[in-house]
Amino acid sequence: MKKIVPIIALFLMMSACVKPDKPKEIRFSVLGDSYSAYEGFVDPETNDVYPYENIGVKSAEQMWWHKVATKTGWSMEKNNSFSGSLVCNFDYVHYYGSYSFLRRMNDLGSPDVIFIFGATNDACAHNGDYVPIVPIGDYVYADWTEEQLCTFRPALAYLFEYLNQMYPQAELYFLLDMDLGSGSIDVDRRDLFIGSIHRIASYYKVKCIDLEGIQKSQWHPNVDGQETIARQVIEALQIDFNV
């Protein structure tokens, strides 16, 4: 017993000197379109941005992703958002197939969480007669052709497949505007896109955050809309990460 006591005391002294591990800093990346593209806060910096000052969003601190970072204590690894971009590789006038989500999905850094925020342009892109022009395509989950990747459903499936393989450590979230294309497309097309996103996200076990009631000016989230997005994203993260 005399020998055991000093050993226990020594163990307790050593334990007291060991500092607990710091919690791992969580880093997130954004793959998006104009809803997330704020001047000076996109990477690459050559990405097209949206002139948010025209609708009253005067600083990056008012953007949804900044609010999420502030609330959670996370840091943004990369914001690879490009105004006007499609998920798919369809190319028409000012809708740039060369800057699609598929062309940029390999440039997100090393995030722990990836937010994919898009599909608005795929649903709403139109010709001079305001007729939607991006084909929705079929449900294809393997062996995609270049032609199929110029349509929405196969492109979204390929995007999720690639992100799961390229960033296996990352949690994926698709942010879905439930009022997709309000005022610019009919309800049937909107519902077709929303249903397609839900189905493909479910197939790949990508978490879909359905965003309701986003306030907009000129079809883009204004100050209140950015706050609405952030609040609903944070609510979802509170369930998964207890932030």
Language model: regions and residue ranges:
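Substrate-gating cap/lid alpha-helix
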Residues: Y162, A170-E212
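Histidine-centered active-site loop/cap adjacent to the catalytic His
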Residues: S217-V243
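Structural recognition of the beta-strand scaffold that forms the well-ordered cores
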Residues: R27-L31, S36, M76-S81, D112-G118, ...
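Sec-exported extracytoplasmic/periplasmic mature domains
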Residues: G73, A119, E161-P168, H198, ...
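Conserved SGNH/GDSL esterase-like catalytic core that processes O-acyl groups on lipids
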Residues: F41-P135, Y141-T145, P154, H220
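Alpha-helix N-cap and loop-to-helix initiation/capping positions
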Residues: G56, V140-T151, I185-L192, P221-G225
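Generic structural signal for well-ordered alpha-helices
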Residues: L102, L156-F160, I194
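N-terminal secretory targeting modules
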Residues: M1-A60, T70-K71, D107-G109, Q165-A170, ...
